[in-house]
Amino acid sequence: MNWTVDIPIDQLPPLPPLSDELRQRLDSALAKPAVQQPSWDPDAAKAMRTVLESVPPVTVPSEIEKLKGLLADVAQGKAFLLQGGDCAETFVDNTEPHIRANIRTLLQMAVVLTYGASMPVVKVARIAGQYAKPRSSDVDALGLKSYRGDMINGFAPDAAAREHDPSRLVRAYANASAAMNLMRALTSSGLASLHLVHEWNREFVRTSPAGARYEALAGEIDRGLNFMSACGVADRNLQTAEIFASHEALVLDYERAMLRLSNPAETDGAAKLYDQSAHYLWIGERTRQLDGAHVAFAEVIANPIGVKLGPTTTPELAVEYVERLDPNNEPGRLTLVTRMGNNKVRDLLPPIIEKVQATGHQVIWQCDPMHGNTHESSTGYKTRHFDRIVDEVQGFFEVHHALGTHPGGIHVEITGENVTECLGGAQDISDSDLAGRYETACDPRLNTQQSLELAFLVAEMLRD
């Protein structure tokens, strides 16, 4: 299948023209060097872009602007940001049970964090577009082209499957649209009921080896819910939840094809350019070159943007990202996602925060405790230890508390499945256990139990 519309490509309707200024900025951005891009035929990719330019978007401007408003609250210390989901989504796992399980886990974490923080938790999933991954090498250990995500090539260790195929751009769109549709349905129906989600958390406390530690907090949430019921509180917010969609803006052929110009009447009287493949997009550690296409592309779009900052980030470089990506000092526009590693975060993060805070910009500070703590197990699996993940979050909180700044959120790779990919946690997963259910298409994820355990631990940090 090469497209999802029944009109020949040469008859597809053109997009509304951009203003001269926007067109110039976009063309300039796309002309810059872009790393980590597929090596497919440019003409074939252009044909697929033409298809994607005509399809309904995955998100709409009003939703994106609503998220930006909620993120402004995070930037101002009035809310907390929880972002999580699969490291890499796959077409084969884009199923109702898998999506439901991931959404359920994110909702369970959010309830615990909301109570711990005593403030709203903004929920953003890695969903409906996380189909591409940067890789450290173009070739894998078998001499095949590296798997770069289902948007680009296949996972099977086969030369034909590993060829970069631009028709996968449209398959990615079709899968993203289906996932987004299901997520909207699930979160507006009974799955998001606060009482139901808390009952799942009670089950976790009852069955987890570490449950006794979290019994008191779960009991407090129980009493709070009982109090609201006794008072007759029946707000719609207790039955539904809003979860926004995010992915790494990596494959520029996909992102540029999903650009749409807003109706000025919908966006404060000004036509804005949105990447409507998602609500929120981030730039990865490997693609954040200041002179590169990814940063320049992010400058042009009106979506909220994140930037991953690893241990090589200097305070001066962080300030440059802030000035480039948040030129109007708009709270909610920019999230700085730090991924330093648990043994470096306490040393490297303070000068970065101090330098950025001195600019007066209100950015969101978010901790990614996953990517700086990856290692190879004795059994040959890429893994992460739960204790190191928790320690990086703890270090992140310690730094912010010392500086008087707001630890704005966490960004984690999780799944609603009972996989064995990360070591430790209350289940005490060991190197020899990893082979049992090691199912990730890329990096190791926290399973449901580990995700909830992390949420309870972060809730304790939020209360301290």
Curated annotation (Swiss-Prot):
From what superkingdom does this record's organism come?
Answer: Bacteria
One Pfam family in the UniProt entry: DAHP_synth_2
Task: Give EC number(s), comma-separated.
Answer: 2.5.1.54
Q: Which Gene3D superfamilies match?
A: Aldolase class I
GO terms in the biological process aspect are: amino acid biosynthetic process; aromatic amino acid family biosynthetic process; chorismate biosynthetic process
Q: Which reaction does it catalyse?
A: D-erythrose 4-phosphate + phosphoenolpyruvate + H2O = 7-phospho-2-dehydro-3-deoxy-D-arabino-heptonate + phosphate
What residues does phosphoenolpyruvate bind to?
Answer: 126, 285-286, 308, 339
- The entry marks the following residues as binding Mn(2+), namely 87, 371, 413, 443
Q: List the disulfide bonds.
A: none
Q: Which UniProt keywords apply?
A: Amino-acid biosynthesis, Aromatic amino acid biosynthesis, Cadmium, Cobalt, Manganese, Metal-binding, Transferase
Q: Which GO terms describe its molecular function?
A: 3-deoxy-7-phosphoheptulonate synthase activity; manganese ion binding
Does the UniProt entry include the keyword Manganese? Answer: yes
Q: Specify the pathway.
A: Metabolic intermediate biosynthesis; chorismate biosynthesis; chorismate from D-erythrose 4-phosphate and phosphoenolpyruvate: step 1/7
Cofactor binding annotation: Binds 1 divalent cation per subunit. The enzyme is active with manganese, cobalt or cadmium ions.
Q: Which SUPFAM superfamilies match?
A: Aldolase (SSF51569)
Q: Which cofactor does it need?
A: Mn(2+); Co(2+); Cd(2+)
One GO cellular component term of this record is: plasma membrane
Regarding protein family, the annotation reads: Belongs to the class-II DAHP synthase family.
- Tell me the NCBIfam families matching this sequence: DAHP_synth_II
Q: What is the documented function of this protein?
A: Catalyzes an aldol-like condensation reaction between phosphoenolpyruvate (PEP) and D-erythrose 4-phosphate (E4P) to generate 3-deoxy-D-arabino-heptulosonate 7-phosphate (DAH7P) and inorganic phosphate.
Question: What is the annotated quaternary arrangement, including any partners?
Answer: Homodimer. Probably interacts with MSMEG_5536.
Protein name in UniProt:
Phospho-2-dehydro-3-deoxyheptonate aldolase AroG
* Source species: Mycolicibacterium smegmatis (strain ATCC 700084 / mc(2)155)
The organism that produces this protein has a lineage beginning with: Bacteria, Bacillati, Actinomycetota, Actinomycetes, Mycobacteriales
